[in-house]
Amino acid sequence: MDRYQHLFQRLAAHNQGAFVPFVTIGDPNPQQSLRIMQTLVEAGADALELGIPFSDPLADGPTIQGAISALDSGTKPIRCFEADQAPIRAQDIPIYLLMYANLVYARGIDNFYQRCQQAGVDSVLIADVPTNESAEFGPAAKKYAIHPIFIAPPTASDETLQSVAELGSGYTYLLSRSGVTGAETKANMPVHALLERLNQFSAPPRRLGFGISEPEQVKQAIESGAAGAISGSAVVKIIEHHLAKPEAMLAELKTFVSAMKSATKHDK
């Protein structure tokens, strides 16, 4: 049983959905980054979505761009796989990477997925690679048992949703709206119609992302039929607002994640 199967079994047993925060590895610095990830897990995060620093994050809004562009913290892409940077092995929860194709190509596709396996990564979402351009990544992902994750946009055709369902595994990244990420632009609710279409194609469990910043949005996502919610910009903003007070940063992150996780409980 892999960590995805274990997670979904546990959530089903407790009548809950998943809450998944996003952070960039090495933000604001390597040492505090590890403390942040540990705090997120201790506060109740069901999984972690991790970004690898990259100078041109096309799909991310200004908040997350600020974190990903902070390469001067000393965190280079290759460092993210080194032992002292990996918060992964000790965690009994799924770890996702959200990244861009150039970082996969940089060291070779096979080598990249091998490094993911060695670091304890469960899945990879390449944000700028749609399903119809993903064929070259599939064999290496399968070889190293890394779940390929694909995005289901709200304007997708049935053909696109079918390919997302057939090629993806682990979970499906369901967009609450078009555009780039950011808590500045609220998620569009509800998403019943898109979820129903994905159900028709037996897509992997759906998690709603983009603009998720409040517990009520998480609750609405779960009530709409999503398996969980992902929040990135709201988490990154907390980090940015407490750069000079690392302990206050961790305390606010703990409060935020606890509240968001509590909102995943299904009403009986």
Curated annotation (Swiss-Prot):
A Pfam family it matches: Trp_syntA
Active-site residues, as the UniProt record annotates them: E49, D60
GO cellular component entries: cytosol
Segment forming the signal sequence: none
Transferase as UniProt keyword: no
GO molecular function: tryptophan synthase activity
E.C. no: 4.2.1.20
Record key words, sorted: Amino-acid biosynthesis, Aromatic amino acid biosynthesis, Lyase, Tryptophan biosynthesis
Enzyme class, spelled out: lyase
Biological pathway: Amino-acid biosynthesis; L-tryptophan biosynthesis; L-tryptophan from chorismate: step 5/5
The keyword Lipid biosynthesis appears for this protein: no
Protein origin, superkingdom: Bacteria
Record family assignment: Belongs to the TrpA family.
HAMAP family, per the entry: Trp_synth_alpha (MF_00131)
Summary of subunit composition and partner proteins: Tetramer of two alpha and two beta chains.
Function according to Swiss-Prot or TrEMBL: The alpha subunit is responsible for the aldol cleavage of indoleglycerol phosphate to indole and glyceraldehyde 3-phosphate.
Name the record gives this protein: Tryptophan synthase alpha chain
Organism, scientific name: Vibrio metschnikovii
